[in-house]
From Swiss-Prot:
CDD domains: F-box_FBXW4 (cd20090). InterPro entries: F-box-like_dom_sf, F-box_dom, SCF_F-box/WD-repeat, WD40/YVTN_repeat-like_dom_sf, WD40_repeat_dom_sf, WD40_rpt. GO terms for biological process: embryonic limb morphogenesis; SCF-dependent proteasomal ubiquitin-dependent protein catabolic process; ubiquitin-dependent protein catabolic process; Wnt signaling pathway. One of its GO terms (cellular component) is cytosol. This is F-box/WD repeat-containing protein 4. PANTHER family: DACTYLIN (PTHR14381), F-BOX_WD REPEAT-CONTAINING PROTEIN 4 (PTHR14381:SF1). PROSITE patterns: FBOX (PS50181), WD_REPEATS_2 (PS50082), WD_REPEATS_REGION (PS50294). The gene is FBXW4.
Length: 412
């Protein structure tokens, strides 16, 4: 008992040990904190880590977000955008940089979150601590457990209404806007049982996007359409655009003034075209000299003037509308000549792509052309495309034909 009491006293004394600036030691530590911050801002990650081992005060001092922000902005998937906006202010920057090294080195733990018996073409979205995923003609909502690498098995909600498979869906204004193989668009309120569907196209609706109360859809019937989200005007088409090609992907500009379509590149020479959202008129087309069949399967805006695209021609292309609409700024080629089904970005340096064979997920550092890491998620007998990718600063989620996979970079 006496020994135990002595140990407790030692622990309490250690806990009470002052984290204040040491009175003795080099004169450097007696400088004003502002000057110390300036000096330490020139240190790299390794030097800051070693300095933190000197004493408790320096460990606290070198954990300051200000010292790690510059390092984080140059790191992969640390929660900072290209313009320096911090998307995760509640998480210490030092902790994010630590996890970022696992992304850079490809250190992760693979797991399977969901399985299904029949082959699917799932799509998914993340929102806060919830995951929404399509299975056949349903959309299911699951809640993540605190570790982010597992799900509560019982769905939070099930959203139905389509007669055929859900091809695509987005989350907008507490609504789920879904595109179905039955040619219909579905509107589901997330926190109620309200569901409306209406006939939108003559054939399956392959893609949909919704921003600012406006819905855009693209279909196999070679049209793109613009719709209002307002409850009193659901199903009233604002514009019908003849694209001369099957529309595989679609995205609204953050400025809400235009939208881009990614088409099959069979009936029209350009698979990427930008349309005026208010008039439905063609504004411009991107690129030139695309080979027939170079369809764009995924397209996304990173900013009002920059966007990324990928598809059948095995390239990811980065476009900047301020420089040129005929030539992309940067491109990355899938090294095994596989179709690229989907892409995701951290808004800064990290790019993730999903390939058509063996469930291969690739990570790219956009500052270099070569692939950084590749993760084959299926073996030869069960080869599957990666239909959809989503990522956070700690995890990457990949939806395949039979499974939903997670790559955990926080606890590799």
């Amino acid at each position: 008992m006496a020994a135990a009491a002595g140990e407790e006293e030692e622990e309490e004394e250690a806990a009470r040990e002052s984290a204040a600036r040491p009175a003795a030691g080099p004169a450097l530590w007696r400088l004003p904190e502002e000057l110390l911050l300036l000096i330490c801002s020139y240190l790299d990650m390794r030097a800051l880590g070693r300095l933190a081992q000197v004493c408790r005060w320096l460990r606290r001092f070198t954990s300051c977000d200000l010292l790690w922000r510059r390092i984080a902005r140059a790191s992969l998937n640390s929660g900072f955008t290209r313009l320096g906006t911090d998307l995760m202010t509640s998480v210490p920057v030092k902790e994010r940089v630590k996890v970022s090294q696992n992304w850079r080195l490809g250190r992760c733990r693979e797991g399977i979150l969901l399985k299904w018996r029949c082959s699917q073409m799932p799509w998914m979205q993340l929102e806060d601590d919830s995951l929404y995923i399509s299975q056949a003609n349903f959309i299911l909502a699951y809640q993540f457990r605190p570790d982010g690498a597992s799900l509560n098995r019982r769905p939070l909600g099930v959203f139905a209404g389509h007669d055929e498979d859900v091809c695509h869906f987005v989350l907008a204004n507490s609504h789920i806007v879904s595109a179905g193989g039955d040619g219909k668009i579905g509107i589901h309120k997330i926190h109620s049982t309200f569901t409306v569907k209406y006939s939108a196209h003559e054939q399956e609706v392959n893609c949909v996007d919704c921003k600012g109360g406006i819905i855009v859809s693209g279909s196999r019937d070679r049209t793109a359409k613009v719709w209002p989200l307002a409850s009193g005007r659901l199903g009233q088409c604002l514009h019908t655009i003849q694209t001369e090609d099957r529309v595989w992907s679609i995205a609204i500009s953050p400025l809400l003034s235009s939208f881009v379509t990614g088409t099959a590149c069979c009936g029209h020479f350009s698979p990427l075209r930008i349309w005026d959202l208010n008039s439905g008129q063609l504004m411009t087309h991107l690129g030139s000299d695309f080979p027939p069949g170079a369809g764009v399967l995924d397209v996304m805006y990173e900013s009002p003037f920059t966007l990324l695209s990928c598809g059948y021609d095995t390239y990811v292309r980065y476009w900047d509308l301020r420089t040129s609409v005929r030539k992309c700024v940067m491109e990355w080629e899938e090294p095994h000549d596989s179709t690229l089904y989907c892409l995701q970005t951290d808004g800064n340096h990290l790019l993730a792509t999903g390939s058509s064979y063996y469930g291969v997920v690739r990570l790219w550092d956009r500052r270099q052309r070569a692939c950084l890491h590749a993760f084959p998620l299926t073996s030869t007998p069960l080869s599957s495309p990666v239909y959809c990718l989503r990522l956070t600063t700690k995890h990457l989620y990949a939806a395949l034909s039979y499974n939903l996979h997670v790559l955990d970079f926080q606890n590799p």
